Structures are given as C-alpha cells and as structure tokens.
C-alpha cells in the first residue's frame, strides 16, 4: 500500500507534468534558471519529500524574476 505522502507527491508531480506539457508551451519559456522551476520542483519533491520539496520549489519560483540579483545556475 502506498503511503499518503508518497501518493500526494505523485499527484503533485503529475500536476507539474501537466503544466510542463499543456500550459508552459502556451505561456512561453521564461524561466531564468538553467533547470526550469517546474523541473526543479519535480526533483525537489523526489529528493526531499512533499513538504520540503514544495517549500523549496516555492522559494525558487519567488526568485524567478528579472530583478533577482542571484546567478541563474541554481
């Protein structure tokens, strides 16, 4: 039986895939980072679990704007 956190992580990752395939091409590719924020989100959720992975993804998305002074290789 799959645990609730693992099931939730799979659902979130599927939603990110839907965004990557269905929505991102319409909006255009504007991510300033070398690994896109959506791919970073998938990797973070897989590596850190759903809570920490989603938190790290939210922080990353908040940094994804042209006025961020950090480099773009994160």
From Swiss-Prot:
Record family assignment: Belongs to the UPF0161 family.
Top-level lineage group: Bacteria
UniProt name for this protein: Putative membrane protein insertion efficiency factor
Subcellular location per the Swiss-Prot or TrEMBL entry: Cell inner membrane
Keyword Transferase: no
Function (record text): Could be involved in insertion of integral membrane proteins into the membrane.
Pfam families: YidD
Keywords: Cell inner membrane, Cell membrane, Membrane
Cited PANTHER family: MEMBRANE PROTEIN INSERTION EFFICIENCY FACTOR-RELATED (PTHR33383:SF1)
Annotated Gene Ontology cellular component terms: plasma membrane
Membrane topology reported for the UniProt record: Peripheral membrane protein
